[in-house]
Structure formats: C-alpha cells, structure tokens
C-alpha cells in the first residue's frame, strides 16, 4: 500500500478511509459506534460513504481529533500501517500548532525582573564542583565560554545522547529569561532547526498548580491543550527537549516533584533535558542524573551592562547620570553584573530621578541595594506623601507573607492569602507579580514576589519587624536553627546572607531609619544570639555569592591554596590612594569557638568547628603577582596578602544603644558586604 503524502489532517483522513476494502470499511463503522463521543446510530453510520463519514467526523470533532478517533478504531482492527500513517500526519501537523502556541505566548509573556534579552556570559565546566559554590570551585580551573546555540551540539561533549545540560547560577543571573528566550527562538526556527520536534518549558514554581500531575497532563499543560496527542509526541523521545526551570524552587514532597524526578531519571522517556538551578540545590539534583554537561550563568559583561542601562533610560541625560553614579561605586558596578540586581538598581535610580530626588544612599552590599529599592517603592498615602503608618504596615505584611511562603515552601499565593496578610496585589506591582492560571473554564489569579530574591529579602526582614519578644516565639527560633543547621545546607542561603548583613550594627540602624521603626530591646537581644549563631557557621560554609567572579584571570587567587579548609576572602582596599592602584587582600581563616544560644543550645556545627580550629594553612605558595579586574575598569596590578587568623578576628564593640555586639575585624568582604 502506498499512501500519498497528505498536506492536512482532512486530506490524510480521506486517503486512509478510501484505502480500506469494503469489509474493512464496514468493520471500522462498527468500532466507531463505540468510540465516538455522541454514539452514532447504526443506521446513520451504515449509509455513509467514505467522503460522508470523513465530513461527519470532522464536523463533530474537528480535523485533528477526527484523525485520532479513526486511528483508535484502526488500532483495534490491527491495521498498523494505516495507524502509523495517520499518527505521523497528526504529529507533523501538531508540531506547527504547538510552535504557533509558543509564539503566541511571547505576546502576553510576563518576563519578570530580567525582562531584557541581553546576551549573558555562559561558561562551560566539566563538573558542578560538588557541594561548593561555583563561584569558589570554578576559580581553580579555566572556564571556556559557550553559546546557547551549541548547548546540544552533538560534538559539544562525548556524553551519550540525548544530552542533559545543567545550567547553574546564583539568584538573578538571568537563567529564566535565557531559557524562555531559547524556547521562543526554537519556535521561530532560529535555534536547533531539525533537532527537536518539541521543546517544552516547565516552571518548577508553577507546576504545583496542576491538579493532577502526571506525564500526559504535564505535556498537555505545556501545550495549552487538553487534547494534545501525547502518545504520538512521546513516540520519538529522542526528539524532545524538556526545560525544567528553577529546580531549586520545586516544592518538596509534592506530586509534581515525583513526576519531574521520573522525567529526570529518563527511564521512561529518554529525552534531552535542560535544568536550571541555583547552586545549593545541586546536591539533591545530581544523584538523579547520569552524564551531563554543566554551564555556569555569570550575568552581564561590561558591554551588556551599558546596553541594559541604555534600554532602561531612554532620556540621554538620565542615562549619563545613572551610568556615572554606578561606575563611581565599585560595589554597585560589580553588582550590576547580575541582571536581577541590575534591574533593581535601574528601577530604583529611575524612580528617584522621576521624583526629582537626590540619590544620597551609597550601597555597600546587595542588602543595601534591596533596602534602597524597597524604601523607595513602599506605597504612599492618597495625597502622594509618605505615610509612616501605611509604609510600616505594608512592610510588615510583605514580611509576614514572605515568611509564610518560606516556611511552607510556597512561592505562589492566592488572592485570599494576600488579603489575609492585608495586602492588595494590584497596588503592589513593584514587589509582586500576577499570574493568570486557567482552571477549567475560568481564570484564577496567583501572586508571587517579583523575584525569589525579594521573597528572601522580606523573609530576612521578618526577624527584625516583630514588635516584642513574644512575637519571636518558638517557631522563629526553630526557623533560625534550620537556617544555620549545617546538615540542611552546605551553602549559606540568600536569606541568611541578607539576615547577616541586617544584623550588623550599621545595618540595623540603617534599616530602622529607612523604614521608620525601632527594633525592640527584647527583640534585639534575640537577634544578637542569631547573629552569633550565624558567625559561628559562616566560616565553615561556602557562600552563594550573588556577584559571581567570572574573570578567568581571577583563578590565580587560588593558586597554591587548599580550598577544603581555608576560606578565601577578596577585598579591594585603599581605593583612593594617590597612585590609583587597587590593593587586593586575600585572607584565609579557620573557624573556631563555641557559641551557645539560649534558644538553639549547643549546635552541632560548633562542635565540628572546634576540631577544625587547630589546623594550619596547607601548601600556601607565593600568590600571583596581580589580578586584572575588568569589571571595576581597572588595569592596574594588585597585590595579595595571606593572613591566617585562628578565630576570624572577632572583637567586642559597643553600639550606640549600649548593646554588646560582635564584629568581624578581619573577614569583611567588601565585594559581598
């Protein structure tokens, strides 16, 4: 049998029916009585010719579904050649339907914080670096740049096909925007032509909304079509690419997690995978994967930073002023390497300029940057004047919402939840995104923070805005214990980084002034213990750095240094020396000391740290003579000093309110606050 190539499902259906012998055609009608949705009467079917039957089915179901209905009946008759013919026609036609669906999504896509399509720096690495942050581990090796176009090139790696690519990067580096742009480019034929029949984007944050999460429903959800031809789509798994975006945001112990884990192990569907994640989640992700390729997302180059500013500031004078302000602040300029933080900085400066306000803040770390943004965008009263009562109420409500989400692994919130916290979603677009989710015939609204970084910032703030010690409660102490428990996290989370910055003396004073609240003395006492607990573990863990060090020459910093027990800190000192040279100080430190909190007891981490406190720096060779830092526009040579500190140089210091606080005298990292 030689069936002609059909140009449409209608044509294919007619060809298949005409190819049947008379007895086979009668048998088909018999099967159609049972499989058709409206149960056609026997007499009605018997009188229909091939053309009439095709027309009747198409009018009842539409061309695509009519082909599927006939295909199921032919399968029952074991006419496999005709089944394969119809399935292939259906699949070929549905590919274009799906591409059109993806292209239409772009028009109503909310790209979130990282809405720019600027090119990002991608570096290929042979491994993830185990449990360490890529910012540290990959300094020890030469990183090769990689393009999105070559991520799945057959010659890219010697790994078995289909390939797995793990794309890792700190919060805000642009992973989500990058993969959404990848899907759009594929749908337009610009990327991977002829390589993938389908590229499915799965948000690990939003997949929990699926009422029934299994693989067929997941594919239908991706297609935006409850009647998607799942069986035909899965027939060639090697031509499928699933993009699992934000593995670190996947809700634990959920049905969605189970389904995605099955997909990652690729036993049932051996497809290509692209998984994006923040580094802390790699420890749980990697055991499920076989051979894979690791790519680091490192944010903007210098050129792309300026391009991004140009897209944000259309007024030339504002653009000039914004660039000058950022370039004159080494911390801000470095921070703007991260697209998410660059968006925060641009939005903050633009709002200040629109109000005609002078920018008096000088951020010294990422916490200061988020603080400046939040204090600028907190709502005003009806007259346009800032109302301390309104601002403080909204701040507390945002903090309580963020804390509830973090406690329950929740990143999406229904409107009722916002109302419970006294928040009005539409009026808080500076902090919240709205997502329209189709539930049956209706639309249900969900809200999320504009970026996970905002939720973690407000979560850290929630420890400070409580009005008295009773509000801290046992639950709060358990939360802090969980944050600092070394068994739970090999890396310091972003929430913990924010909290550590806030608990510094100058940090708490600054927050109180900006947000017009005073930290209650009893709460301050609790926070002191939290700070001591964080300091006890900060030397033992790697930090999930927001500002990735991508310059290949920076790897010289680790030459001759054993990174297992030594903590490496980079400081830019003497910025205003007359010779204009930027000194670079590298300090190694070992953890020591035992901190006891009345709420947390003798933490396991302190016992482990005491054992390590007697160590010595191993194999310290003479460091590289200089490091070029193109991100800070410096071509000068630096120098490095290696200093071993037994206890990190903790000193006692009195703050303005007479509270005894501990301050790290040697380990202050100017680049990360």
Swiss-Prot record:
Disruption phenotype: High susceptibility to systemic infection by C.albicans with 100% mortality by day 16 post-infection. Does not alter Nlrp3 inflammasome activity and up-regulates Gdpd3 expression. Does not impair skin repair after wounding. Also does not impair the irritant contact dermatitis response following treatment with the irritant croton oil. Significantly reduced inflammation in dinitrofluorobenzene-induced contact hypersensitivity response with reduced numbers of CD3(+), CD8(+) and CD4(+) T cells. Gene3D superfamilies: Death Domain, Fas (1.10.533.10), P-loop containing nucleotide triphosphate hydrolases (3.40.50.300). Residues 163-469 form the NACHT domain. The keyword Nucleus does not apply. One of its GO terms (biological process) is positive regulation of T-helper 17 type immune response. GO terms for molecular function: ATP binding; ATP hydrolysis activity; GTPase activity. It is found in: Cytoplasm; Cell membrane. Expressed in skin, tongue, heart, colon and several cell lines of hematopoietic and myocytic origin but not in kidney, skeletal muscle, spleen, liver, lung, thymus, brain or small intestine (at protein level). Residues 649-658 have a biased composition (Acidic residues). Residues 584-597 have a biased composition (Low complexity). Residues 1-92 form the Pyrin domain. It is a peripheral membrane protein. Residues 633-648, 659-673 have a biased composition (Basic and acidic residues). ATP binds at residues 169-176. Signal peptide: none annotated. InterPro entries: DAPIN, DEATH-like_dom_sf, NACHT_NTPase, NLRP_innate_immun_reg, NOD1/2_WH, P-loop_NTPase. Residues 578-673 are annotated as: Disordered. Keywords: Adaptive immunity, ATP-binding, Cell membrane, Cytoplasm, Immunity, Inflammatory response, Innate immunity, Membrane, Nucleotide-binding. Inhibits autoprocessing of CASP1, CASP1-dependent IL1B secretion, PYCARD aggregation and PYCARD-mediated apoptosis but not apoptosis induced by FAS or BID. Displays anti-inflammatory activity. Required for immunity against C.albicans infection. Involved in the innate immune response by contributing to pro-inflammatory cytokine release in response to invasive bacterial infection. Contributes to T-cell-mediated inflammatory responses in the skin. Oligomerizes. Interacts with PYCARD. Also interacts with CASP1 and IL1B. Interacts with NOD1 and components of the NOD1 signaling pathway including RIPK2, NR2C2/TAK1 and IKBKG/NEMO. The pyrin and ATP-binding domains are required to elicit cytokine release following bacterial infection. Belongs to the NLRP family. This is NACHT, LRR and PYD domains-containing protein 10. It comes from Mus musculus. The lineage of its organism: Eukaryota, Metazoa, Chordata, Craniata, Vertebrata.
């Amino acid at each position: 049998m030689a069936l002609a190539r059909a140009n449409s499902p209608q044509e294919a259906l007619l060809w298949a029916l005409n190819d049947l012998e008379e007895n086979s055609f009668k048998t088909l009608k018999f099967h159609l009585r049972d499989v058709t949705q409206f149960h056609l009467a026997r007499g009605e079917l018997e009188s229909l010719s091939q053309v009439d039957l095709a027309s009747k089915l198409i009018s009842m179901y539409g061309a695509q579904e009519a082909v599927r209905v006939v295909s199921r009946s032919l399968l029952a008759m074991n006419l496999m050649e005709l089944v394969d013919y119809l399935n292939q026609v259906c699949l070929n036609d549905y590919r274009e339907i799906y591409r059109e669906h993806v292209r239409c999504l772009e028009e109503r896509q909310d790209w979130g914080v990282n809405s720019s399509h600027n090119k990002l720096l991608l570096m290929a690495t042979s491994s993830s670096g185990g449990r360490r942050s890529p910012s540290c581990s990959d300094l020890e090796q030469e990183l090769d740049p990689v393009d999105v176009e070559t991520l799945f090139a057959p010659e890219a790696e010697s790994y078995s096909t289909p390939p797995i690519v793990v794309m890792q990067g700190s919060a805000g580096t642009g992973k989500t925007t990058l993969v959404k742009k990848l899907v759009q480019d594929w749908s337009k034929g610009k990327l991977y032509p002829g390589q993938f029949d389908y590229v499915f984007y799965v948000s690990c944050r939003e997949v929990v909304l699926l009422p029934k999460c299994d693989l067929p429903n997941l594919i239908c959800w991706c297609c935006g079509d409850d009647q998607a031809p799942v069986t035909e789509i899965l027939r060639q798994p090697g031509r499928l690419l699933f993009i699992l975006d934000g593995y670190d945001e996947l809700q634990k112990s959920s049905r969605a997690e189970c389904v995605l884990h099955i997909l990652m192990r690729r036993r049932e569907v051996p497809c290509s995978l692209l998984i994006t994640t923040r580094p802390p989640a790699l420890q749980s992700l990697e055991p499920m994967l076989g051979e894979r390729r690791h790519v680091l997302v490192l944010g903007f180059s210098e050129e792309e930073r300026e391009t991004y500013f140009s897209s944000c500031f259309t007024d030339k004078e504002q653009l000039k002023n914004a660039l000058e302000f950022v370039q004159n602040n080494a911390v801000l300029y470095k921070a703007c390497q991260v697209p998410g933080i660059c968006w925060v900085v641009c939005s903050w400066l633009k709002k200040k300029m629109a109000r005609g306000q002078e920018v008096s803040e000088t951020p010294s770390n990422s916490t200061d940057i988020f603080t400046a943004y939040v204090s600028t965008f907190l709502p005003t009263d009806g007259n346009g004047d800032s109302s301390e009562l309104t601002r403080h109420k909204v701040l507390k409500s945002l903090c309580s919402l963020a804390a509830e989400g973090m406690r329950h692994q929740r990143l999406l919130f229904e409107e009722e939840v916002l109302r419970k916290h006294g928040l009005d979603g539409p009026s808080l677009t500076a902090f919240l995104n709205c997502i329209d989710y189709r539930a049956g015939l209706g639309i249900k609204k969900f809200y999320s923070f504009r970026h996970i970084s905002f939720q973690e910032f407000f979560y850290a703030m929630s420890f400070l805005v409580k009005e008295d010690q009773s509000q801290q409660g046992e639950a709060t102490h358990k939360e802090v214990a969980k944050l600092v428990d070394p068994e739970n996290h090999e890396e310091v989370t972003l929430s913990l980084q924010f909290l550590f910055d806030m608990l510094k003396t100058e940090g708490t004073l600054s927050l109180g002034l900006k947000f017009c609240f005073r930290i209650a003395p009893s709460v301050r006492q609790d926070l002191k213990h939290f700070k001591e607990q964080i300091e006890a573990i900060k030397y033992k863990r790697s930090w999930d750095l927001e500002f990735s060090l991508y310059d290949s020459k920076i790897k010289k910093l680790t030459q001759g240094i054993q990174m297992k027990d030594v903590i490496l800190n980079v400081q830019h000192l003497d910025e205003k020396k007359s010779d204009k040279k930027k000194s670079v100080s590298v300090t190694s430190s070992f953890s020591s000391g035992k901190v006891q909190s009345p709420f947390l007891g003798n933490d396991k981490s302190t016992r482990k740290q005491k054992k390590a406190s007697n160590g010595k720096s191993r194999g310290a060779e003479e460091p590289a003579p200089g490091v070029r830092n193109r991100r800070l526009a410096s071509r000068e040579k630096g120098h490095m000093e290696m200093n071993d500190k037994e206890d990190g140089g903790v000193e006692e210091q009195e703050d303005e309110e007479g509270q005894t606080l501990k301050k790290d005298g040697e380990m202050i990292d100017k680049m990360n606050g």
